Amino acid sequence: AHPMKAVLTKPVYGLFQTMAPHAPFALRVVLNNLWCFGGLLCLLAEKLGGEVNAMMRTTFAFTMAQGSKQINVMPNQAVAGVNVRLVNVDTPESVKTYMEKVIGDPHVSVCVTHAQSATPYASTDNAHWHKLSAAIAHTWKGCLVSPYLMIACSDSRHYTGFCDDVYKFS
């Protein structure tokens, strides 16, 4: 496996800062000192896998493969389909370049059939966020309100063209 580089983006940093006071001591030390342990956390993301890993790097899911119709017959051509979920530091072009470099074979072509950049992060430094946070905290007493990087695709991406900030609720 050749995962792309993990990055500590603003929403993930905010999530970790919100979680820190509620974490067990050792994890609290790490989360309160991301300036020192951020690199370690990025390395651990791959080992932890799952949601933490997906929040910190562009991910790949191989969803389709086609080749020969028979087990014992070599195909003239083989095709694989890959679903890529981008973290904001990556672009469709940078991922294509990365895949070509990792594959390292000029006989294999990487074609982008559909591409959409990651949606922008919503600000947590404005009155809208503070009002939303207060309403959530008021409605669900004791609930932690935190920035979060939604790793699923949603229809909210359609609102980014006419809204400065689109907040997703999970």
Residue positions per predicted region:
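An extended, acidic, His-containing surface patch that forms the Zn2+-binding/catalytic region
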Residues: M4-Q77, N88, E93-T97, K101, ...
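Hydrophobic beta-strand positions in extracellular immunoglobulin-like domains
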Residues: V84-L86
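Alpha-helical metal-binding/catalytic segments enriched in His/Glu/Asp
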Residues: A1-M4, V82
